[in-house]
């Protein structure tokens, strides 16, 4: 949930802020509003919960993952997808590797959801 003080800070920028839901994002309402505004593509840079919400609703076309040379983790580390997840691999989203790119000391993997 966006804090009111953070929403207030955004007012100084030439952007439109969409509030879609009370305590969490109402994805279907958000996509309906974006469609009305003729927006057909979005870049989702969410946390694990937001990412999982879009994946479980089959709303993701591509996934781009950057592998960096840092080891982080632990019990409270952010994950790519959070929430209930898929109980079995057979039911999970299938990915097809489209591209691999190396930039300096990082590797970017571009997958298509099939």
Which stretches of residues belong to each language-model region?
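Enzymes that bind and transform nitrogen-containing heteroaromatic metabolites
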Residues: 1-43, 47-114
């Amino acid at each position: 949930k966006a804090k009111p003080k953070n929403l207030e800070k955004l007012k100084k920028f030439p952007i439109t802020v969409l509030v879609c839901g009370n305590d969490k994002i109402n994805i279907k309402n958000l996509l309906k509003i974006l469609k009305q505004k003729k927006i057909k593509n979005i870049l989702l840079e969410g946390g694990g919960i937001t990412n999982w919400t879009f994946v479980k609703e089959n709303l993701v076309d591509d996934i781009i993952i950057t592998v960096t040379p840092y080891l982080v983790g632990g019990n409270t580390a952010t994950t790519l997808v959070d929430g209930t997840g898929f109980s079995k691999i057979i039911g999970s989203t299938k990915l097809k590797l489209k591209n691999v790119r190396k930039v300096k000391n990082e590797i970017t993997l571009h997958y298509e959801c099939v």
